């Protein structure tokens, strides 16, 4: 099979699975008065926030309403556990592919449990709109929603293994894109705004500015010069092509995905309790809450550092440089190199996280200043994920093409 044909088939396979994942959202869970439910939650801020990840699934309560969120949440928990539990860290690092498969299997079980809990919360939440709410309905709805979430998880893994790009990221990408037309029309054409054309122009300018900033954050790189043993004594001028690239945002799109998915948790929990005090506390961390931005910024910073620690280990980099006979000019090999790289990574991660949160803050400022409502659905979280996933997928396609070229050259 030719290189172009193989790539084309992978892209077709990916698109087919994305279409299947999208269709499942429109298959309703039986027993619910969906028209009454939709009319009730259409302008609900919490539901609109959750719809970012489900592509509108929480407005229709389709069998794929949970989407990929349970799998993402279980991945967060699993990655935290691998840092805390030595046996899991050893399993991930030292046992190769077999160890990674075991980690993946544990993550699936966690996703199953998480999906079951969320399904139960939804079955209680929709009680006022159910024709005959009883134990049988709860069991049936939990089974349908959990099965739908497991199917989505399976589709995401198939995309990652046999398609192009990261399956979970592409599914979220698709869900966000599917909601853009509705949010766009609500923001400008269905609302009674004065000076609509001026606000529309302002929105376009700011939207493009946010894209530029996002690309800068995703692609910004600090190049650390390195010199090999072969260069020593030959020339006092360093080869400009010999450098160690450290990205401004090592985690790519994942910190914002993890932070946003975590921010959905308070919204879920509000459906599980009727306690007035607990509801007041939870609402503080919901999209319109006074502590929402504070928690959001802390989570972005935390996941940026956390994900950087996973993908970039200064000790491993220093060891690999030593094996290659390379070093950083004016920095001693060994612990000095590790300390130097750690300081650089910490600074880059903080700067990258600050940029991410700045972009996340822009839609809130626009809503207050320009009085443009519903902008958050078109805003920071969505934009960061859209641009990040688009860049990552394009790079994966490019890497795939290059690797196939090298394979054909070596045969």
Curated annotation (Swiss-Prot):
Keywords recorded for this protein, A-Z: Chloroplast, Membrane, Plastid, Protein transport, Thylakoid, Translocation, Transmembrane, Transmembrane helix, Transport
PROSITE patterns assigned: SECY_1, SECY_2
Classification via InterPro entries: SecY (IPR026593), SecY/SEC61-alpha (IPR002208), SecY_CS (IPR030659), SecY_dom_sf (IPR023201)
Protein's GO biological process: intracellular protein transmembrane transport; protein targeting
Source species, domain of life: Eukaryota
Subcellular location: Plastid, Chloroplast thylakoid membrane
Gene Ontology CC terms, in alphabetical order: chloroplast thylakoid membrane
Membrane association type: Multi-pass membrane protein
Transmembrane segments: 13-33, 52-72, 111-131, 135-155, 163-180, 197-217, 252-272, 291-311, 350-370, 377-397
Pfam (any one): SecY
Disulfide-bond pairs as recorded: none
Job description of the protein: The central subunit of the protein translocation channel SecYE. Consists of two halves formed by TMs 1-5 and 6-10. These two domains form a lateral gate at the front which open onto the bilayer between TMs 2 and 7, and are clamped together by SecE at the back. The channel is closed by both a pore ring composed of hydrophobic SecY resides and a short helix (helix 2A) on the extracellular side of the membrane which forms a plug.
Subunit and interaction comment: Component of the plastid Sec protein translocase complex, which is composed of at least SecY, SecE and SecG.
Family statement: Belongs to the SecY/SEC61-alpha family.
Protein name in UniProt: Protein translocase subunit SecY
Lineage: Eukaryota, Rhodophyta, Bangiophyceae, Bangiales, Bangiaceae
Gene coding for it: secY
